[in-house]
């Protein structure tokens, strides 16, 4: 349902809440979702990965393994600086890279059925050797590596996450109390690029991200730069980067 023009689905979800609002699902041929534009931003809980999504992959790969650290940081910043409520997956705050595999504690016929079911599910995936869900080592491989947060890379990730959370608490949370319904607008989309803005009584928040391989020209984003990563952008956004701006006041546009 999201493979075709994923940037359009993401932009709409950020601006309006749901990617599908009654449109026909390409996968099922049935209507999917309901209209969400009447809801305030805090009605939506967003995540870029969770236990179900990661655990159902054959090898339990986290986003950092699939997309790389640079893209993942851009997406993490988008998650934490949008007006929706963010949900972090365990270890995401320090860049945990261990997999989160599908594991169970079943016995007898049920254990056998689950093992065979997982193998059958990925039978058409060439080269995939699915770990046994009931094997103790499958569970052990899925446990967090708490030492990683104390590594130089882990410390940098934690500092990055803390900075984003502080910015959210100081600048974005105060806007949300007066938000009564969806106030988002999709400004621009292109492969790997989106720009969205949200208008509140207290100001206009704008966000643009680029995880493509090329530089993209920015639309007009009003206000002062709240956050830019890896550096400030002037008129364009390079690959694997993000900018968030805030224009204060009810008349901000």
What is each residue range found by the language model?
Residues 48-50, 58, 148, 198, ...:
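Pocket-edge structural micro-motifs
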Residues 13-33, 88-89, 94-103, 125-205:
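Glycan-recognition and catalytic regions of carbohydrate-active enzymes
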Residues 233-253:
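C-terminal beta-strand-rich structural cap/linker in extracellular carbohydrate-active enzymes
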Residues 214-231:
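Beta-strand-rich binding/interaction modules
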Residues 39-43, 81-84, 189-190, 201-203, ...:
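Short, well-ordered loop/turn elements at secondary-structure boundaries
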Residues 60-67, 232-240:
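Short, polar loop/linker segments at the starts of domains and inter-domain junctions
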Residues 208-212:
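Asparagine-centered strand-capping/turn motif at beta-strand->loop junctions
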Residues 1-124:
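Conserved alpha/beta catalytic core and glycan-binding cleft of carbohydrate-active enzymes
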């Amino acid at each position: 349902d999201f493979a075709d023009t994923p940037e359009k689905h993401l932009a709409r979800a950020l601006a309006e809440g749901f990617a599908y609002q009654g449109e026909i699902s390409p996968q099922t041929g049935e209507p999917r979702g309901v209209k969400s534009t009447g809801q305030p931003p805090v009605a939506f809980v967003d995540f870029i990965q969770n236990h179900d999504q990661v655990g159902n992959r054959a090898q339990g790969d986290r986003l950092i393994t699939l997309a790389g650290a640079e893209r993942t940081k851009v997406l993490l910043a988008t998650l934490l600086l949008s007006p929706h409520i963010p949900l972090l997956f365990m270890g995401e705050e320090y860049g945990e890279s261990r997999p989160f595999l599908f594991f169970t504690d079943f016995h007898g016929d049920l254990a056998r059925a689950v093992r065979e079911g997982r193998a059958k599910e990925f039978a058409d995936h060439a080269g995939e050797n699915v770990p046994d869900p009931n094997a103790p080592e499958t569970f052990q491989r899925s446990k967090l590596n708490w030492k990683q947060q104390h590594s130089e890379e882990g410390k940098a990730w934690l500092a990055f996450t803390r900075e984003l959370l502080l910015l959210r608490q100081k600048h974005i949370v105060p806007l949300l109390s007066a938000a009564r319904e969806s106030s988002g607008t999709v400004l621009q989309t292109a492969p790997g690029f989106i720009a969205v803005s949200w208008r509140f009584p207290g100001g206009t928040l704008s966000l643009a991200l680029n995880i493509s391989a090329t530089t993209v020209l920015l639309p007009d984003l009003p206000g002062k730069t709240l956050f830019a990563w890896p550096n400030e952008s002037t008129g364009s956004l390079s690959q694997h980067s993000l900018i968030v701006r805030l224009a204060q006041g009810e008349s901000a546009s």
